[in-house]
Amino acid sequence: AMLDIGEASELDITEKDFDFVYNINVKGAFYGLKYVMPIMKQQKAGSIVNTASVAGLIGSPNMMLYNSSKHALMGINKVAALEAAPFNVRVNTVNPGVINTQMMRNIESKVAPGAAEAAQAAYNDAVPMKRYGEPEEVANVITFLLSDEATYVSSSSFTIDGALYNV
């Protein structure tokens, strides 16, 4: 989840902000794994896909909480995948980049108050494919990872960002 706490340097982050972001992005995934993994292990089958972000692969100024929480989620998934593999349970991560969602509308408005269209144009220009991804494009990757077509895919991270991460 991209959380609405605004951008802040590490010196301005409060404990309340820290807890808010980590409770959702890290604890939420942790508890999901904690309570579903035993069932999947017992069934000797299952697939879990958690959504991190391109932000979990990089660092961004004034985005310490969001970026670091997504890094943490990716680490949790790596360990969970190793622990679940002997039980035929798969754990993977998707890392969306700039996706055409309400979250991006909020970011555009914050980055360029009163000029959201200019912000959107700048984001489009930054992406090598010159466009935002669509939610369905992320959903298609998740659908594949959850399907029987991906039974040997685990501990993997899939970046869906129009090659932005390579820039």
Locate each region found by the language model.
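Short C-terminal tail/terminal secondary-structure segment
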Residues: 58, 143, 154-167
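Short, small/polar-rich loop/turn modules that mediate ligand/substrate recognition or access, typified
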Residues: 85, 90, 153-155
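Alpha-helical segment proximal to the catalytic Tyr-Lys
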Residues: 38, 82-83, 151
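Active-site helix of classical SDR
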Residues: 33, 69, 77
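Residue(s) in the substrate-gating loop at a strand-loop-helix junction
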Residues: 53
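Catalytic Tyr-X3-Lys loop
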Residues: 11-30, 49, 73, 129
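Substrate-binding pocket helix/loop in short-chain dehydrogenase/reductase
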Residues: 6-10, 14-19, 119, 123
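Active-site loop-to-helix junction immediately N-terminal to the catalytic Tyr of the SDR YXXXK motif
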Residues: 8, 13, 59-67, 79, ...
